[in-house]
Amino acid sequence: MARADTGRGLLVLTFCLLSARGELPLPQETTVKLSCDEGPLQVILGPEQAVVLDCTLGATAAGPPTRVTWSKDGDTVLEHENLHLLPNGSLWLSSPLEQEDSDDEEALRIWKVTEGSYSCLAHSPLGVVASQVAVVKLATLEDFSLHPESQIVEENGTARFECHTKGLPAPIITWEKDQVTVPEESRLITLPNGVLQILDVQDSDAGSYRCVATNSARQRFSQEASLTVALRGSLEATRGQDVVIVAAPENTTVVSGQSVVMECVASADPTPFVSWVRQDGKPISTDVIVLGRTNLLIASAQPRHSGVYVCRANKPRTRDFATAAAELRVLAAPAISQAPEALSRTRASTARFVCRASGEPRPALHWLHDGIPLRPNGRVKVQGGGGSLVITQIGLQDAGYYQCVAENSAGTACAAAPLAVVVREGLPSAPTRVTATPLSSSSVLVAWERPELHSEQIIGFSLHYQKARGVDNVEYQFAVNNDTTELQVRDLEPNTDYEFYVVAYSQLGASRTSSPALVHTLDDVPSAAPQLTLSSPNPSDIRVAWLPLPSSLSNGQVLKYKIEYGLGKEDQVFSTEVPGNETQLTLNSLQPNKVYRVRISAGTGAGYGVPSQWMQHRTPGVHNQSHVPFAPAELKVRAKMESLVVSWQPPPHPTQISGYKLYWREVGTEEEADGDRPPGGRGDQAWDVGPVRLKKKVKQYELTQLVPGRLYEVKLVAFNKHEDGYAAVWKGKTEKAPTPDLPIQRGPPLPPAHVHAESNSSTSIWLRWKKPDFTTVKIVNYTVRFGPWGLRNASLVTYYTSSGEDILIGGLKPFTKYEFAVQSHGVDMDGPFGSVVERSTLPDRPSTPPSDLRLSPLTPSTVRLHWCPPTEPNGEIVEYLILYSNNHTQPEHQWTLLTTEGNIFSAEVHGLESDTRYFFKMGARTEVGPGPFSRLQDVITLQKTFSDSLDVHAVTGIIVGVCLGLLCLLACMCAGLRRSSHREALPGLSSSGTPGNPALYTRARLGPPSVPAAHELESLVHPRPQDWSPPPSDVEDKAEVHSLMGGSVSDCRGHSKRKISWAQAGGPNWAGSWAGCELPQGSGPRPALTRALLPPAGTGQTLLLQALVYDAIKSNGRKKPSPACRNQVEAEVIVHSDFGASKGCPDLHLQDLEPEEPLTAETLPSTSGAVDLSQGADWLGRELGGCQPTTSGPERLTCLPEAASASCSCSDLQPSTAIEEAPGKSCQPKALCPLTVSPSLPRAPVSSAQVP
């Protein structure tokens, strides 16, 4: 039941909306009253219907009209079979019996003469009032312009059918399924714009659908379209589909009170959520309802509903979304907010009517006097944008009704007010016998006779004059004393018609105006010379062409022209005269390749005016004429105030030219005075601007941004593939700017003010402006010029016309700066473009993938990528996306995704399998979202070599052998010490480090005391690129093992350094592990170690070696110490997994391990800071457990933070850490994430002994 009520409610709502628009068919006969009110009225006549138009202007006219006249489309109404004038002044109209598409010619004629715009004039004693317009249309219904289309929709999806047709009145759209009206269900949504939406599609919805349009004229059926329902998930196109807006809202303009539907249908898998917001952030009005699930319905649109509405569709459980925006513009018909008031004025006084109107867009105002449009003249002025009407020197002819009519695109409104002219008794009559006699081209003598009645009461006269022709003429007046009846008027324009009249004044008031006197001022010599154009059709001729002078410069009728010419450097000048109706002359029998000077002057009946400036031209040479084009013919230039319009005709043999070159320059004051600068025949002088290259088909070009009243020279040459041709030259002045002190004609409108551009989307920009703050003309529309910023190609500039004060410009490129300029247009005149406003469109997803993707294998597990940015990024690239897989048939979400920053253009992908084919594709992402991926590219990784395939067991064997050799070496050293009992221990050495205790030592060759020793055990932490250094030389590639009193430990720093030392039995328990330590710097002998103990560089097994050495030492330490070996035995093992990673200790020395002579007490320095390892782990834990600085100076011990054993994640390389930017390329290198060290492998502690 609720569903049925919803369907009926929509039909009732549609009926009410049509009633509000005045588009419902009328009953059999209806009366429509026409008055001075809002309009126009729209009357639609259906079949067999009639209407009576009643001219009800009695209230306005202060009584019933004495006479009513009707007009149709501005002409007098003629009666016919379907139109009759009734005795009461009303008009009866009926619709013809035949339809519009009938074959009866008579019916078609009656149909055409019936439709039109009807208005009436009501005549009364006070004046005439014009009614509003009634537009009469006959009901029609056109064929469908859009038929529904068949479609396949999955279950629970959304189906949408659409049809379009036009008719009067607007047809009601219904839908049928299998030729039966669709049931009234909430799932079936019928929109007024001819759309049927079927939500949650079911199997029962399958069938044939058609659209039915019905109005008072007829009923029409559309073509049928089938709906096929498929199983959910069976359509591959919709499986996992991203969110897409299937039906987006459209920009809509409606009149206030009409309904509007903002439709939005989205599709995705799963079904998306749809929401609406206003772009300006304001809340959506509460009277806006949701029709169906995703559509907005505004039943009665008001100006407050205007704005941009954004539909957003979100895919559930994802961040994918799509948006669509549309502007709703609600127009408001004009309404008179301040009507003019009735006035009563005495003769010769001033009347002022004020009218104000509101509406959207802002209405334009014009005035009627007794039903006739009022044209401003000298006495009647329209001010304030049409809102004020001022009438001076009121006469009886000015009495009547004045109507203020406001008009915009939504309708009209009017208000009327009468003007009564009061004539007092005893006023003088009008002056008589007014005459105007021309004295010269600029002066007229006006005379009159005194009035016949009450002449003795006259205290003075007023003389009024204005131009007799043209519109918007300014009226001038002079006050004249009573003692004279004539006046000489000066400063008139030559060859111009003027109208004069006189008014007499007494103490009681003014008389009527006298009869006008017309006069034509005398001719004068022309105030300027025609502007010349010179060209040579052959070597011995010069064609001279000019344009006729305008009437403002000719000062009369031009009767003749005089052309003077001669060689450039000779005094002899020839002249010839031609009639005034000629505009060109050919000078014959001239010398080839010579410079001639030419000038022209125009003559009227008063004589010749000033001649033009000398203009020089070189005739072509007689040789090599086959390749040199002649000058263009008939070069004409029409001068404007700030531009020159250049037009021409092709030269002889136009097929031989490739185009034209146009030059122009401003002639300086000195040049203008002497005019002796030779122009040259083929471009041998410098020009301010040019050349502008034009195609051969172009025959007109306008030079803009010129200075008014300046002398310019223009040169046009034709060129071909060989060279430039001969020039056609013109010299003349632009029009002068109007002088503010003199009476001027109304100038062009000013550019709009407050031009503002606002980005609307990635492809559209809103441009808004306001009417000029001051203008003397009525602005009818505007032109918007726009193009990409900094554009030099004029063919890419676009122009739009707008009647309002804003426009939405679409079809733009994303993330592109555009420049805009707006121009105002008056009636028959165009204003200049205003200042340029710049604005960029919003960014969007990239339209193209990264370009020039190149792949190259580096190692069996590494591939390097190089690419270039997308050709159409549509914004700033913030991230590049790399997808790769060894199986290109896998779904895209199963590929490995790597990301890198937007300013990097190369990368390395690690962790790949050797000798495997990988497929790569790349995409780019802006802040809006990702763009498309590139096409697939494949690469095969390298095969593993022998060194690459060396297994861990072989490496382990090598390391075990090295360790065993090291243990044997130490055992031999201990045995040798026991057999050397005859040697005496050095005083001052003991296990406790106190002087006087005996000690044993091996002979060792002391190294340079000034070079520090560096002994490191590298961890698996990858060296940072900035810590890289080249491998040491052979001399530096050695380590030393010193005697019992080991040398100092170097101050090598780095997070990857590890150090190990051990002593005889009773060695300490190893305590903890450290990321690295900074040990005291010292000097002294270094322990030596043979190179055989060093593992191969780059084996990557340092951590395993560390564990093996540690286990061997630990097992040796379990033996019970011998009393004979109580002295400290110390050695350091140096193992580098990569010598190139050692940066702090580049000067390592490797010395042979052979017996040396024992050191004496005198040669061996006393120890300082030597540690007895027999004290066990307690001492070591006490000294190193905190890893905090305990001393200062040379014996400090500083540990770096224990960070190597902690896990590390590189968030900037998520979701995979297998990528490293290649150093040395455009990518900036990044430090790789250090690998985690297993806690099950112990780390060797560090012992320190220093000999100061």
UniProtKB/Swiss-Prot annotation:
This protein's GO CC annotations: plasma membrane
Keyword Phosphoprotein: yes
InterPro entries associated with the record: FN3_dom (IPR003961), FN3_sf (IPR036116), Ig-like_dom (IPR007110), Ig-like_dom_sf (IPR036179), Ig-like_fold (IPR013783), Ig_I-set (IPR013098), Ig_sub (IPR003599), Ig_sub2 (IPR003598)
Secretion signal span: 1-22
Residue ranges annotated as Extracellular topological domain: 23-956
Residue stretches making up the Ig-like domain: 27-136, 142-228, 241-329, 334-420
Domain Fibronectin type-III stretches: 430-524, 526-622, 631-742, 751-844, 849-944
Positions of modified residues (Phosphothreonine): 994
Primary localization: membrane
Side Cytoplasmic, residues: 978-1252
Tissue: Expressed in skeletal muscle, heart and brain. Brain expression is hippocampus-specific.
Compartments in which it is found: Cell membrane
Membrane topology field: Single-pass type I membrane protein
Coiled-coil ranges (or none): none
The keyword Transmembrane belongs to this UniProt entry's keyword annotation: yes
Disulfide bonding pattern of the chain: 55-120, 163-211, 264-311, 355-404
Entry keyword set: Cell membrane, Disulfide bond, Glycoprotein, Immunoglobulin domain, Membrane, Phosphoprotein, Repeat, Signal, Transmembrane, Transmembrane helix
Protein name: Immunoglobulin superfamily DCC subclass member 4
Chain's gene name: Igdcc4
